[in-house]
A protein has these predicted regions:
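N-terminal periplasmic "start-of-domain" segments of outer-membrane beta-barrel proteins
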Residues: 10-41, 66-71
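Extracytoplasmic beta-strand/coil segments of soluble accessory domains associated
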Residues: 45-92, 96
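Short acidic/polar hinge/loop motifs at secondary-structure boundaries
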Residues: 92-119
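Periplasmic-side early beta-strands and strand-to-turn transitions of outer-membrane beta-barrels
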Residues: 123-124, 136, 142-145, 149, ...
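Conserved C-terminal beta-signal and adjacent last beta-strands/turns
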Residues: 163-169, 211-214, 357-358, 413, ...
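Surface-exposed extracellular loop regions of Gram-negative outer-membrane beta-barrel proteins
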Residues: 226, 268-272, 324-333, 376-392, ...
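Outer membrane beta-barrel strand-and-loop segments of large Gram-negative receptors
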Residues: 292-305, 346-354, 450-456, 462, ...
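Gram-negative outer-membrane beta-barrel transporters
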Residues: 360-366, 374, 481-485, 506-601, ...
Length: 666
């Protein structure tokens, strides 16, 4: 599953609408998930979860997570649900234009050939948003795969991807459907008549057409997705949908010939959310907010020029993105109807230029890069009206703001022997606030979080050192790192319910009022270990560990947070897996994930207990390309705490779920 990116370029696939991995990436922390790992995954974020400390904001996968908490972070230092990692598919960002989260249902694993997880490593060629790193998805170029499976609680999944030729065109098509009746997250004795299952219906489809043009390749891709899900209580649900279009022209680098890429893309998204207030005994709910229309659109352009000569590889590039969107809501439910409306949104943009270079001299690899970005937020507004009289309640139009950010990175790697290597790196990165953070308040149960149009970009600096050993039977990697986030965007508690507060309005008993703020800094030091052993033919053992001690320094902005841990950031996390082929047609595998306790709030008052989950799978090959399998997720039915309210009501992750299915790979 894990390996360093090769220093020597892989064999060039002429149908790929992407440049090959840059040689300089080997100087940074990169984990590669291969096709075998993706073959066993039903959801991409679950496959990424095999890497310690990588995951969504809460201890939930995208199977049960609200769209707004599906943002990804690659180290346990992110203080909110906004994604701190940039996720791209062949160069096109998948992060939502409005909120920065990722709707993972839009990317069935069957449509991918591999994934590179770049932990930290700086903004580099990736662009804004790569604060804790980047996830680089590679779409399938050849062959195909499909999966059909059914599971407990009305679960079913059908997904497939294929390729073929149509005259001079090469096509790649992928589609997926998934549903589940879900589980009830709150359990007795806390559960009441208002608690409901986290049901889900999701679908996606994409088509890519590749046209060779001399030594270059022109690729056009279109995609659509939609998901509907319950939120666990009566009257609360969410629906997310979107489209993506991209056009990419690529020329692969060759001996003595430069390579280049020019890409334009457009994404649209919409989100609907219904939020409720829950009675103290959870016997009933009342509507609190209806986010009925959240249209957002993003456009992007990027280009790169890469050359290689005499062991020196260089890349020059530009990257520009623009997003606009707004939320339309009804709130303040009184007398059986909503009494107020809200329109809030604006526009953000970022544009940058960068230069990257790497040089190989004997056992040494040296890599570095410099980047300059201009960011801006403009045309912001938050307008609230009384629905009966149409009178203005709030008309807030914050001033336009902009700035520049310089990012840099430097890495070195030395081969100490045919098996051992050592590396060191220093880097910086930044993430501008999303439209969601700037302009949209939100509600979860009785807790309310206010927006803040004055947020400035988060900036991360870091250093790390690492060693690696690679042999035919044992791979070992170890990394020590220190990261610091300046102007960290934190949901800061500023009030307790019951009470009426400016802008936010009424906060019920047991609820809290928070506001997004640039609350000082987060400093983290950590250790990452990964081991993969192949003691004999047909047996592979893997284990990995992450230890991250992250602490907040709230400074004068939020002194009450100083010394505390970021919300939902455990110190310890570990994974282990075994793949065994006891007979030619049989494969047995098991995976375990453990993490220490974490906190569900900024004040570290809501404690979520440590969690250990184990999953197991047995697969029987029926033919060279067809297999039947059975899998038990959360085999021992562990209680995994995912959230806690101000009154102590705990939500849990899914119980044991057994799946059976057929998979074909060709």
């Amino acid at each position: 599953m894990m390996q360093d990116p090769p220093v020597v370029l892989d064999e060039v696939v002429v149908t790929a609408p992407r440049l090959p991995a840059a040689e300089g990436e080997a100087a940074f922390s990169v984990i590669r998930l291969d096709g075998a790992t993706l073959d066993r995954a039903t959801r991409l974020d679950e496959a990424l979860g095999q890497v310690p400390a990588v995951g969504l904001f809460r201890r939930t996968s995208s199977l049960t997570a609200n769209p707004t908490t599906q943002g990804l972070s690659l180290r346990a230092i992110a203080p909110t649900g906004a994604g701190r990692a940039l996720v791209t598919l062949d160069g096109v960002p998948l992060n939502d234009p409005f909120g920065g989260w990722v709707i993972w249902a839009q990317v069935p694993p069957e449509g991918l050939s591999g994934v590179d997880v770049v932990r930290a490593g700086g903004t580099g060629p990736y662009g804004a948003g790569a604060l804790t790193g980047s996830v680089l998805l590679r779409e399938r170029d050849t062959d195909g795969a499909w999966t059909a499976a059914i599971g407990e609680r009305g679960s079913a999944r059908l997904a497939g991807s294929g390729t073929g030729d149509l005259g001079p065109l090469r096509w790649v098509a992928t589609a997926g459907l998934e549903r589940t009746d879900g589980h009830v997250p709150v359990r007795p004795p806390d559960a009441g008549a208002a608690d409901r299952p986290l049901d889900l219906e999701a679908g996606s489809a994409s088509l890519r057409l590749d046209l060779p043009m001399g030594g270059a390749l022109l690729s056009a891709r279109g995609a659509v997705f939609q998901e509907r899900r319950g939120s666990g209580v009566e009257g609360s649900d969410a629906e997310a949908s979107g489209t993506a279009l991209s056009l990419t022209a690529t020329r692969q680098p060759d001996t003595g010939q430069p390579g280049w890429r020019v890409q334009i893309w457009r994404r649209t998204s919409d989100l609907q959310n219904r939020f409720v207030a829950t009675a103290p005994d959870r016997s009933s709910t009342s509507l609190a907010n209806h986010q009925f229309h959240t249209p957002a659109t993003a456009w992007g352009l990027n280009a790169a020029w890469r050359t290689k000569r005499d062991g020196l590889e260089t890349e020059l590039g530009v990257d520009a993105r623009r997003a606009e969107g707004e939320t339309n809501e009804r709130y303040r439910f009184m007398g059986g109807e909503f009494t107020r409306s809200r329109q809030a949104g604006g526009e953000t943009s970022v544009a940058g230029v960068y230069a990257e270079a790497s040089a190989t001299r004997g056992p040494w690899l040296m890599a570095g890069g410099l980047r300059l970005d201009h960011w801006s937020t403009r045309d912001g507004l938050r307008v609230e009206r009384d629905l009966q009289s149409d009178a203005l309640v709030l008309d807030d139009r914050p001033s336009d703001r902009s700035g520049e950010v310089v990012s840099a990175r430097l890495g070195v790697r030395r081969a100490l022997s045919p098996e051992w290597s050592a590396r060191a790196a220093a880097y910086s990165a930044f993430r501008p606030a999303t439209l969601n953070e700037l302009h949209r308040p939100f509600r979860v149960g009785n807790d309310i979080t206010e927006a803040n149009a004055a947020l400035v970009p988060e900036q991360l600096t870091g250093i790390e050192v690492g060693v690696a050993r690679e042999t035919g039977q044992l791979d070992l990697r170890a990394t020590l790192f220190a990261n610091r986030i300046e102007d960290a965007i934190v949901n800061v508690t500023i009030g307790q319910g019951p009470g009426v507060f400016p802008r936010a309005g009424f906060v019920p008993a047991g609820g809290v009022l928070r506001e997004r703020q640039n609350a000082g800094t987060i400093e983290a030091v950590g250790l990452e270990l990964e081991v993969e052993a192949r003691p004999r033919e047909g047996l592979t053992l893997r284990t990995a560990l992450s230890a991250t001690d992250a602490r907040v320094d709230g400074g004068s902005q939020a002194p009450q947070l100083t010394g505390l841990r970021p919300a939902q950031a455990p110190i310890w996390s570990a994974t282990a897996s075994v793949d065994w082929t006891p007979a030619p047609d049989w494969t047995v595998s098991a995976d375990a994930r453990w993490e220490s306790r974490r906190f569900d709030d900024d004040l570290n008052s809501r404690v979520l207990d440590p969690a250990l989950t184990v999953s197991a799978r047995a697969e029987r090959r029926l033919s060279p390309d067809l297999a039947a399998w059975v899998e038990a997720v959360n085999l021992f039915d562990a209680d995994v705490e995912t959230a806690e309210t101000g009154t102590g009501v705990v939500s849990f992750g899914p119980p044991r779920t057994v799946w059976i299915g057929l998979s074909r790979r060709w």
